Amino acid sequence: MSTGTFVVSQPLNYRGGARVEPADASGTEKAFEPATGRVIATFTCSGEKEVNLAVQNAKAAFKIWSQKSGMERCRILLEAARIIREREDEIATMECINNGKSIFEARLDIDISWQCLEYYAGLAASMAGEHIQLPGGSFGYTRREPLGVCVGIGAWNYPFQIASWKSAPALACGNAMVFKPSPFTPVSALLLAEIYSEAGVPPGLFNVVQGGAATGQFLCQHPDVAKVSFTGSVPTGMKIMEMSAKGIKPVTLELGGKSPLIIFSDCDMNNAVKGALMANFLTQGQVCCNGTRVFVQKEILDKFTEEVVKQTQRIKIGDPLLEDTRMGPLINRPHLERVLGFVKVAKEQGAKVLCGGDIYVPEDPKLKDGYYMRPCVLTNCRDDMTCVKEEIFGPVMSILSFDTEAEVLERANDTTFGLAAGVFTRDIQRAHRVVAELQAGTCFINNYNVSPVELPFGGYKKSGFGRENGRVTIEYYSQLKTVCVEMGDVESAF
């Protein structure tokens, strides 16, 4: 498959183990190929009736799945992981077409996806409570049990990976899931649904409904939904939390960020420069945990900035399906214009553009209507600038200087966000001292934007709560039952 050739020809909802047209509608959406600007799908958004059918179907599957042993669930999840590995190129290609990221990155995303399924497959059989001895031979014990039907609402920057991150722990714990992808990237979640079915989950255990805000509202307010896990913006996350609260539903929120990356003068310069590029330009800068506020100690500011600009200008932009491309297009035209608008405001507020920040038109004529821009490096930035305070969600790096550790910590924490943070230094004591003070849920030392599935990922403050990945996520997809066992006579007050 090549850029500019794919068109969706099958239904984009998945219910009961098969692709289906929605039973009713709440509008229509168009999905684009960012590389070319072509419409690849016009699809119906799921209405309240379709959402209810998906939830009821998942509820029936839950009754079967939750009764399986952890080892039985483990074997099926391992089979799903094997199929993902086997179909990696196909899935990665679909991610490129619908999302715009390079095939190089997309393959890494799919690797992380199957690793996530393998990880939680291993934990499925380890779910256990504890035994507590009580006086007189009595005792208590706890049971960790599934919640029921969980809802996953995904973002458009990592469509397949986020669907995997949300569904793997949910299914490992014995739950069912109804998943709603972003309407910008509706395609690849269907591949995951088909893979789960092929691996042997009960029909309906992982259903997919398409749509925007109205569909999301139907899901969050459904009385048979036990939990909602959302990845996306802060304003939408607040609405989801409010809707879920009315049904006393627990939520996991992975929201936005404006993360600091602190470069001390004793850093390994080569690694720090690579870390800054990783912190700003993966997936065209459309990553919630990006370290877009790059604080550089004054002693190395000029040298660091020079190297960053040099490396940024070498980034190959173009057709995301070409092996040597390292930056594809942004997700859509309105978002491209929004990001360019941030660069314009930054210049008006006194920032200096050292490279990029403008539209890029590839030589290939089929790409002329794609949503490309050159990655941008800004200097002369101040903490009160819009480009430093607000999440841009594009390939725009803001470089700021600092003098002391105490100063940079105060400035780094001066934000309503708290998703991630990073530090580059050779001083191991300083590294641990600094991350202990950073108000962020995910911190990196001498690296940035790596995602081992063994480690929990999530934020502080307005970046949300709950976690994706790691053993702790089992607790967010299960509930604890306490059982008290009396081995003697009842001591009655009456």
Swiss-Prot record:
What are the residue positions of the site described as Transition state stabilizer? Answer: 157
Q: What is its main location?
A: cytoplasm
One GO biological process term is: carnitine biosynthetic process
Q: Which EC class heads this enzyme's classification?
A: oxidoreductase
Q: Which GO terms describe its cellular component?
A: cytoplasm; cytosol; extracellular exosome; mitochondrion
The annotated consequence of residue 116 to S reads:
In allele ALDH9A1*2
N-acetylserine PTM positions? 2
Q: Provide the pH dependence.
A: Optimum pH is about 9.4 with propionaldehyde as substrate, and 7.5 with 4-aminobutyraldehyde as substrate.
Reaction(s) this enzyme catalyzes, per UniProt: 4-(trimethylamino)butanal + NAD(+) + H2O = 4-(trimethylamino)butanoate + NADH + 2 H(+); an aldehyde + NAD(+) + H2O = a carboxylate + NADH + 2 H(+); 4-aminobutanal + NAD(+) + H2O = 4-aminobutanoate + NADH + 2 H(+); formaldehyde + NAD(+) + H2O = formate + NADH + 2 H(+)
Specify which residues bind NAD(+) according to the UniProt entry for this protein.
Answer: 180, 232-236, 391
Subcellular location per the Swiss-Prot or TrEMBL entry: Cytoplasm, Cytosol; Cytoplasm
Q: Which family does it belong to?
A: Belongs to the aldehyde dehydrogenase family.
- Under which name does UniProt file this protein? 4-trimethylaminobutyraldehyde dehydrogenase
- Organism of origin is Homo sapiens
Q: Could you tell me the gene encoding this protein? A: ALDH9A1
